[in-house]
Structures are given as C-alpha cells and as structure tokens.
C-alpha cells in the first residue's frame, strides 16, 4: 500500500472534530457492525469527555480506496501549545474544521497559524450546516480572510472546501445538497493532501510524542522522514543539545484503526511507534547508527504562569487520598514533565513545596484534576503570572481575548475588562450578540471569567490566547470582598448559617465538616471576618409561639477547580483531595494571621 496521507485536524473547542473522526472511522469500517463503542471515541480520558476538549493528541489510522490515512487529532486550546507544535510536525496537511454558525475562533487561529508556518496544505470543512441561521458562505470567506491575515501563501489560499453535518453523517461540495455519507470529505483528503515528501538517505525520525506502557516502558512516536526502520536495528539518538546516544529498536508498531500493530519494518512517510528505546526525550532524532544526522528540534512555547504545589497539611489530610506525602507529589510531577512539554518544575527552599510553571490556569488545572482523580491530596497557591526582564524593562505576558455576549450587557463587560487594563481592539455585531476583541495582560484574565458570567447572567463566551510579552501595565484591582473564615472545627449547623446569611454568601452546606481557618464564604465587606457556624441553638424552656421559624438557607456556592484557583487571594490555598475542594487560609488560626499582619 504505497499511498499514505498524514493529516492533522484543527478545530475550535466543541466544533465537532472528535465526532467527525468517529464518523470517518465508521465509514472506513473500523468497527464490526454489532460493536457498540459509544460516542467521542477519541477523547479517551474522562476529563476530556466531561470538558469536551482534547488535551493530548491522538493518532488514528484508516484505509480508504487503498490509501492509508493517518489522522492526528490536535488539542484546540492554546494552553496546550506544547502539544500542538509537536503534532503538526507529523502531518503533511491539515483539515480545518469550522462551525457554520460561529466561524473561525481565536483558538483556531493559534493552531492554524502554526500549521501555515510549517508549510502544510489546508483543507476546510464547514461543519454543522444543519444549525439554524448559519451562514456557510460567509464562514468560508472568513476562513479565507483569516488565512490571508496569518500570511498564507497562494497555494495555501487555494484551499478545497466541503460542507456538511458530521452528526448527521453527511458531507457535500454544496451545503444545500445533503448527501448520504462523508465520502466527499475523504475524497478531498486523498486528492488534495500531498503524500509525504521522502528524501533519499539514512534513517531520520523526529520523536514528537510518547506513550507509556507499564509492560514495555516508554514508547517513542513520530513520523519516519526518510530511510527504513527494522525491528532489532541499532540506531543513534541525536539529543536536543547535539549529544549522540547509541540505542536499539526492540519492536516497531504502526497505527491501525485505534490501536497499533506490530510490524517488522516501516517505510519512510508513515507514523510509527518504537518500543525499547532507552533514555529518549521528545524532540530527539532517531538517526543512523554510523553517521547520525539530527533534524531541527521543536521550539516549545514558554510557560506564562506559575503555581505553588504543596502537601496537604490541613486538619483533614489523608482522609480521602492515597498519596499525600511530598515524595509522592514530587514523583508524580517529575513523571508528568516527561510528556507534558510546556510544563516546568522548580524546587523551593522548603522540601514540601514545588513551583510548577505552565501555559495558563487551564493547563495547570487539568494536571491538578488528573492527579486528584489518581488519589493525590495537595494544596495549590494563587496562580502567579511570570514576569520577565527584557532589555532592563519588566514585562508581563499579554493575551488576545475575545468575548461573545448579548449586546444588552456588553457595556458592563467592556467596563470590567478596561478596569483590568484591557484595551479594546475591535467590536462587531452578530445578530443580537456582540463580539469584542481585547488585548489584556494575563494577570487581568485571572478571575475575570467568574465576574463576567455573573454580570452577563451566564451568557458570555470568553476565549483567549497568549500573544507576547509587553512592558508591565500597572496595578490591577484584586477581589473586592473579604472571606468568611471558620473559627472552630466541627459541623456546619443550619441555625448558625441562617443567622450569618446577611454577612455574605456561603460555600459550605449545613452538615458539612469544616475546620478552623477554612474559608467558608465570601464576606459582603472588604475585610476577612472570623465566624463560628458550629454553634447550635441554646435550648431553654421558654418558648413563644411562632418564634421558631425554620431556617431558610440559600444554597451554597460550589466552585469548579479553575474557579477556585482564580478566586483565592495571596494568603489562601485551594485544598484538593479526591472528593473535596476546600478553600483555606495559609495560616489557620486568627492569632497567627493577626500576628503576621502586624509584622
């Protein structure tokens, strides 16, 4: 089978790329007729399915009309920029998937820009044309304008397009004429995506991602640029810094369907997995044993944000989790560094605190959520933006942010963003909604989403991506309200919560276990207030009729992990355990906090 096509799929969160890949797999009969696989086959960890985002890239391979098509699913989110660049290195063309109603979004621009720079051929799929009020032609023009802006060359601007609805299982050259299957899409891939360029010469393969199997250890994945790899062959590894390490390939796998199949040899142009390589890293080149030649390594986006990870030392530590010591946390973070390229870790002067650097709150919260599900307990400090000194000037990361919201509430939102040093770049009306673009420091984005959703009754859609470092923009107002802090350990009693409701909003339900120093609510004023919600009603034998009204308690506010991280202040931690998220003061007792203040 000589023909191989390697394509990467680019799409904004929730424009349907994972659904599209599902349909391609069904069309190419990867599954037996009676097999029930569930939807979203590619998003294979629970976190991805719940959030509807792809975090790590996947490889799937199908055969269509004697052509082997390797489909590489890319993460759509700029926080996972490290993943994106590696993945595009394996592809020869990209399939750009856009929603017929929303058009190309900022995150799409980020990945597409990388693909255009690498000189890949784009093909466009306008999906969800069955939506009401959609405008496929305008979206097609918007994609053209976007590519032109990014600096695509003429041959890239001459891109083929198909329209369709992946969920309904059809694609067509004309969106007004639905077909019965997705063949037009596959035909477009076979016809327009170039086959891999294969040079003559010795073996060369850039390791672009890795997998881990407890049975065989780490597995290197990449596309073989030239030459032929055979099982048992001796090779050289050219490291990122130019060092050369000798190694040997024990087993070779190629991708087939969703899985891998063991083969004896792999020809140039195909994507393969090597088992048994010792000591490789992502970005190394697998080269010839005698005269190794390295390939250009991948530049990875630098981290822009840091958080402090520390052991859980609250009064409730060890109740939920299996792994609670600093050794466990350090081992887990070190393991994550191997495959999570945009992540960095630094040890601090304390043995149980680690600084972890990443691309944004989402990037780090996905790691924390994964650890939490694996049974770890830990505490996280407030996210801090990384400030760099460039030519003697202090600079901070700046992002491009797009907010899509109803026109009625746009004034409030614009005011909120400008207070946080955001500058509006453009504003356009789409029906009854407005799409506003801002340039805003990353510091300003932390905690903005919560306030925006409150101000717009949950209607605002916010996306942002990192652009560059710019000189510091000055002070940004922090959270206005103080915290309600528990002064006793015990159970929250409805009677006490009821009496304190006019003091602020609570984060705990009646009956929940709490401890001294836990942040159990938000004060309606600006300072912190210690309250006791463990007090019960004193029972005396004097009763007047009607005085014992039932406590009417407003439901507690429950945070998601990102919301909690964005909410806390400098002197607070988020306590993360497999079953609970709690906010707490770093210093638990009121006396300690007062003493610390006076210093």
Per-region residue spans from a language model:
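P-loop NTPase switch module centered on the Walker A-proximal segment
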Residues: 1-98, 102-104, 138, 142, ...
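Conserved structured catalytic cores and adjacent interaction surfaces
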Residues: 2-19, 78, 91, 101-113, ...
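Residue-level signature of catalytic and energy-coupling elements of molecular machines
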Residues: 14, 20, 52, 71-73, ...
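Interdomain boundary/hinge elements
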Residues: 37-42, 150-162, 196-206, 242-255, ...
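Canonical P-loop GTPase G-domain recognition
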Residues: 121, 131-191
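Conserved nucleotide-binding/hydrolysis modules and their immediate coupling elements
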Residues: 204-307, 315-319, 481, 490-540, ...
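A short, contiguous, amphipathic alpha-helix enriched in charged residues
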Residues: 314-337, 550, 554-556
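Acidic, low-complexity intrinsically disordered tails
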Residues: 582, 588-599
């Amino acid at each position: 089978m000589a023909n191989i096509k390697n394509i990467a799929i680019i799409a904004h969160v929730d424009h349907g790329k994972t659904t599209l890949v599902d349909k391609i797999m069904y069309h190419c009969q990867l599954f037996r007729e009676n097999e029930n696989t569930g939807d979203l086959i590619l998003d294979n960890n629970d976190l991805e399915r719940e959030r509807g985002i792809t975090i790590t890239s996947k490889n799937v391979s199908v055969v269509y009309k004697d052509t082997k098509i390797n489909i590489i699913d890319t993460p759509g989110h700029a926080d996972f920029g490290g993943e994106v660049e590696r993945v595009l290195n394996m592809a020869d063309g990209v399939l750009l998937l856009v929603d017929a109603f929303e058009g190309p979004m900022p995150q799409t621009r980020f990945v597409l820009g990388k693909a255009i720079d690498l000189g890949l051929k784009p093909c466009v799929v306008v999906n969800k044309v069955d939506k009401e009020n959609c405008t496929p032609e305008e979206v097609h023009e918007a994609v053209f304008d976007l590519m032109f802006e990014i600096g695509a060359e003429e041959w890239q601007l001459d891109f083929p397009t198909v329209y369709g609805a992946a969920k309904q299982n059809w694609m067509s050259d004309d969106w007004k004429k639905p077909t019965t299957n997705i063949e037009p899409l596959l035909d477009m891939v076979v016809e327009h995506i170039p086959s891999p360029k294969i040079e003559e010469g010795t073996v060369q393969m850039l390791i672009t991602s890795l997998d881990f199997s407890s049975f065989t250890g780490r597995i290197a994945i990449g596309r073989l640029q030239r030459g032929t790899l055979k099982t048992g062959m001796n090779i050289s590894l050219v490291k990122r810094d130019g060092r050369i390490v000798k190694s040997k390939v024990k087993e070779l796998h190629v991708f087939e369907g969703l899985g891998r199949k063991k083969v004896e040899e792999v020809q140039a142009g195909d994507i393969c997995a090597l088992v048994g390589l010792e000591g490789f890293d992502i970005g190394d080149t697998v080269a010839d044993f005698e005269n190794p030649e390295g390939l250009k390594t991948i530049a990875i986006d630098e981290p822009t944000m840091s958080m402090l990870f520390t052991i859980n030392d609250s009064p409730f530590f060890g109740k939920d989790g299996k792994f609670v010591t600093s050794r466990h946390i350090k081992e887990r973070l070190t393991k994550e560094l191997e495959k999570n390229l945009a992540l960095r870790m630094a040890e601090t002067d304390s043995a149980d605190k680690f600084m972890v650097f990443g691309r944004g709150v989402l990037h780090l919260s996905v790691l924390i959520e994964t650890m939490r599900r694996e049974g770890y307990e830990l505490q996280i400090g407030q996210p801090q933006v990384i400030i760099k000194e460039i030519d003697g000037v202090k600079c901070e990361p700046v992002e491009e942010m797009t907010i899509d919201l109803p026109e009625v509430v746009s004034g409030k939102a614009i005011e909120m963003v400008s207070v946080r040093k955001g500058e509006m770049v453009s504003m356009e009306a789409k029906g009854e909604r407005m799409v506003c673009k801002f340039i805003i420091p990353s510091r300003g984005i932390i905690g903005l989403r919560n306030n925006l959703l409150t101000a717009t009754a949950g209607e605002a859609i916010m996306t942002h991506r990192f652009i560059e470092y710019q000189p510091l923009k000055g002070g940004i107002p922090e959270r206005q309200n103080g915290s309600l802090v528990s002064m006793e350990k015990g159970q929250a009693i409805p009677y006490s919560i009821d009496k304190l409701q006019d003091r602020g909003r609570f984060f705990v339900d009646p009956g929940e276990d709490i401890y001294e120093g836990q942040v159990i609510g938000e004060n309606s004023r600006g300072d912190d207030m210690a309250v006791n919600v463990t007090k019960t009603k004193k029972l005396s034998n004097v009763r007047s009729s009607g005085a014992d009204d039932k406590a009417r308690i407003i439901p507690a506010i429950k945070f998601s992990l990102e919301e909690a991280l964005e909410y806390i202040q400098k002197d607070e931690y988020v306590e993360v355990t497999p079953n609970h998220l709690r906010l707490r003061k770093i210093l638990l007792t009121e006396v300690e906090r007062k003493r610390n203040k006076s210093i």
